[in-house]
UniProtKB/Swiss-Prot annotation:
It comes from the Bacteria. This is USG-1 protein homolog. PANTHER family: ASPARTATE-SEMIALDEHYDE DEHYDROGENASE, DEHYDROGENASE, PUTATIVE-RELATED. Belongs to the aspartate-semialdehyde dehydrogenase family.
Length: 317
């Protein structure tokens, strides 16, 4: 492989670390990684790639033309950076699906619909969907290869890290305060020891970009007091009975016992390999139910984004 790949990462510190860890494990030969601080790092926060310090650039000083690929995990109001990078010749991996509503931007989940990368050159942008959608797509893909589905219901239990690193810190702080009998401020949104509904727009549309034949998917999401790990309870229904026998794969691990986000975090802590864990599979009338868990930072975002980059590179983009 060509050893001249220059890669920029535009994400918060914690996610940037996980992307770099995954790049170090990739077969891609990368000459340089840089951080673009669209979300400013703390003074003591530094990234290392292959034991070397990584330069940290402000969005105002970056020359996007210096990079071949950009990992972007910013908010909708920051999409001007995506446009600038793409216009200057970079291939931009939109990690959070903020561009997924654009008809000429492909929405791709690795191993599921990589043929859509043919559309990449229209804008030099490809969207990885929201972690809720990518996790669901990976579990539905084997079913849709065998049968048609007329309805999918999914309830996602969202950890603090799904929002951002600041929310993780808030949850930790609130938990400690409440355990020590210190009440929260009246105006403070309570995260610890509580749950509440979470609204994420356009998830059904993102899923249909991946599976055009699936036009009835209902998403429910609940913010839960867990630090890391996205869990989903899924019911997939057809017009007739079907036999769902999932297999272990590169990305999916079948589990005989129930895996929760906390158990998954404990088991994968310190391990290079991360997977989407599937358990509690049971038949229902004309359908199937199952439970899936993944570390949405290390798996849904970092690993899938790097897998997407590898697919893009292998197709010559």
């Amino acid at each position: 492989m060509d050893a001249t790949l220059n890669i920029a990462i535009a994400a918060e510190f914690e996610l940037s670390e996980k992307i770099v860890e995954r790049l170090e494990q990739s077969a891609l030969e990368i000459s340089k990684v840089s951080i673009v601080e669209i979300i400013p790092f703390e003074e003591e926060q530094n990234i290392r790639f292959r034991n070397k310090g990584v330069e940290q650039l402000s969005p105002n000083e970056v020359e996007w033309a210096d990079f071949n690929y950009v990992f972007f995990a910013g908010k909708l109001e920051q999409v001007s950076h995506i446009a600038q990078a793409a216009e200057q010749g970079c291939i931009v991996i939109d990690m959070l699906g903020v561009c997924s509503a654009l008809s000429d931007v492909p929405v791709v989940v690795p191993t599921v619909n990589e043929s859509q990368l043919l559309e990449l050159r229209q804008r030099n942008i490809v969207s990885l969907p929201d972690p809720q959608v990518s996790q669901l797509a990976l579990t539905l893909a084997p079913i849709l290869q065998e049968t048609n589905l007329n309805q999918v219901f999914v309830t996602s239990l969202l950890p603090a890290s799904y929002t951002d690193a600041e929310t993780v810190t808030k949850l930790a702080g609130q938990t400690a305060r409440l355990l020590n009998g210190i009440p929260l401020d009246e105006e403070e949104t309570r995260l610890a020891f509580d749950v509440y509904p979470y609204q994420t727009p356009n998830l059904s549309n993102q899923l249909q970009r991946i599976f055009p034949q699936l036009d009835r998917a209902t998403f429910h999401a609940i913010q839960v007091p867990v630090f890391y790990g996205l869990a989903q309870k899924v019911t997939a229904l057809s017009d007739y009975d079907f036999d769902y026998q999932p297999q272990n794969s590169e990305l999916i691990a079948l589990e005989e016992t129930l895996i929760t986000p906390v158990l998954n975090g404990e088991q994968e802590n310190g391990e290079e390999s991360v997977k989407l864990h599937l358990s509690q599979i049971s038949a229902v009338e004309n359908g199937v139910e199952f439970w899936s868990v993944a570390d949405e930072q290390r798996f849904n975002l970092a690993l899938l984004s790097v897998k997407l980059l590898e697919g893009i590179y292998q197709q010559g983009y």
